[in-house]
Amino acid sequence: METIKKHYFSDIGVMLGRSMRHIFRSMDTIITVTITPIAMMLLFVYVLGGAIETGTKNYVNYLLPGILLIAIASGISYTAYRLFMDMKSGIFERFHSMPIAGSSALWGHVLTSLVSNAISVVVIILVALIMGFRSSAGILSWLAVAGILAMFTLALTWIAAIAGLSAKSVDGAGAFSYPLIFLPFISSAFVPTDSMPGPVRAFAENQPVTSIVDAIRSLLAQQPVGNDIWIALSWCLGILIFAYLFAMRVYKQKAA
């Protein structure tokens, strides 16, 4: 059993290395998913921020959590694209004929998404610091933020895996991400939900992004998190489990 586990994780490591090499050979993926959220952050802070009432003195502090989620939602679309291209090229069939763990190729793509999105998040936070972002959070709060963002990334990445495995075209593989990118705009990411019309506010307060954004914002400000963190974790974990099981089912059907 220990030998099987060792080979399984070794196979995943090889596939992760393969996918990461593709990323670093073509850095436009990370650059694209980093530059767009940064441009959005610049626009909202320096052009629109003065007209938005959030109850905080520093709008970039309020804005950053939502920008990070948008960056992640943008980044996972490339996972769907890369998976689709692997399926189309027939490389998965070649992997299945080799003495390696069957799902290691899929896990390689998922972990690559986690690493590449983590790089984007770090770059965006560094830019936010230059723009005036400040946090009083301690190491434990930062670790909690990292954990929430990692779970959010994994949850969306497994959704991306479903799209990449099921899509009939390149456009179809990436199109699923548009609603995910749009969700932060109907949440507390940019403005408090109190300012929204009734039906919009009801939707905003009961969708996953608002609780995730509020939890991260409170952690970074060293403020009481309340139930937001548990609601955020429940959303992330629920989506992660469902998407993982569905993606593995689709993968096994494709591999059969």
Question: Where do the PLM segments sit?
Answer:
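Hydrophobic alpha-helical transmembrane segments of multi-pass membrane transport proteins
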Residues: 39-44, 60-131, 178-179, 184
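Membrane-interfacial helix-loop-helix junctions in multi-pass membrane proteins
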Residues: 22, 53-54, 187-242
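Transmembrane helix-loop-helix hairpins at lipid-water interfaces of multipass membrane proteins
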Residues: 35-59
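Aromatic- and glycine-rich beta-strand/loop motifs that create alpha-glucan
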Residues: 1-36
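Alpha-helical transmembrane segments and their short interhelical loops
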Residues: 102-177, 224-248
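Short cytosolic juxtamembrane segments of multi-pass membrane proteins
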Residues: 249-256
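Transmembrane helix segments
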Residues: 44-51, 164-206, 210
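Short alpha-helical transmembrane interface motifs in multi-pass membrane proteins
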Residues: 2, 25-29, 72-77, 107-112, ...
